[in-house]
Structure formats: C-alpha cells, structure tokens
Amino acid sequence: MVHVRFHSVYGSTARYAHELARRLGTTACDFDTPVPHDAQPLVVLSPVHGPSIPAVKFARSVSPREIAVAAVGMTLPSVARSKDCLASMVPASWGRFYLPGSLKYSTMQSGHKATMASIVALVTAKPMKSANDKSMISMFQRDTDWVDFSELDAIQHWVLERQNCV
C-alpha cells in the first residue's frame, strides 16, 4: 500500500494529503511518522517555503523506492509546472507535482506577513509584471484558497501506475 507523508503550515497541504490518502485507501501521516522499510511507493507533500520545499529533504531521507514529491504553493499552477523547480532538486525518476494551495493572511504569522509585504512591494515596483506577479499583488492581505482536489488526479494516476492498477 502506498505511503503518504506531509508537512503543512496553514492546512492546505494536509487537506490534499488526507484526500489523496482517502482515494488510495491509506492514511496520510505527518513527517514525524516513520515510513516503513518496504518497496511501496511514497508520495510526499509540503508547501513551498521560498526556495526550499521540505518534502524534498524528507523524501531524500527515506529508503530507496518509487517516490513522488508534491509542492503546494501560490504560484499560478501553469507557471509552477512550466518552471518545474523540482526538476533541479530531485532525481529524474521521481514524480514531480505542483498543487495550488491556500494563503490565509488572517491566520498568518507576523514574520510571514512581513516577508510577503516585502516581496509584494518588490513585485509591485517592477515595470513589467507577469501574470503570476499580478496574481500575487491581487491576493495580498486577502485570504485566498485555491485548493482543487481534481489536481490530485495526476498523483493518483502516478501511484496506480506503479501498483499496476491502470
């Protein structure tokens, strides 16, 4: 049975992990739960934290197996997929997925709010703004929820392929 592990800060990653686990008939556990030493596939989900994705570090610590990493963030999904930042972080054999998340300024920690204010100020000052820049500016200081469980279809398919179910 596939293993699902996640790290969540504001909740959207946990929502995705639990829904994926439900679809696959397993349980989603946080990073504190060890992954059994078996040959079952592993899907690891975490938010994007600036240039780092905690799921990558966690997945690298696990015994060799089929692994997929899902980065949950607020970059427009089409931009995240075209940039494919995970490609330079993980082996080519790993599955790489990008899921739209949620950002809730109403519950955000003050340090994160300050970081976002700085980033948005820099982006606002750019003379030529991309669609992603405009998106970031428009959601500044607003609770935004882009969670879309249909985005899990590709990960579910990846798992089922590895279990010879498709």
Describe each region flagged by the PLM.
Residues H7, L45, P100, I137, ...:
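Generic secondary-structure boundary/loop-capping signal
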Residues R22, F58-S61, D84-S88, A117, ...:
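Charged/polar, solvent-exposed surface patches and flexible loops
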Residues D32-G111:
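Helix-loop-strand module that forms the ligand-binding subsite of alpha/beta enzymes
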Residues T115-V166:
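Glycine-rich phosphate/pyrophosphate-binding loop and the adjoining helix
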Residues M1-V62, L160-V166:
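N-terminal beta1-alpha1-beta2 submodule of the flavodoxin-like/Rossmannoid cofactor-binding fold
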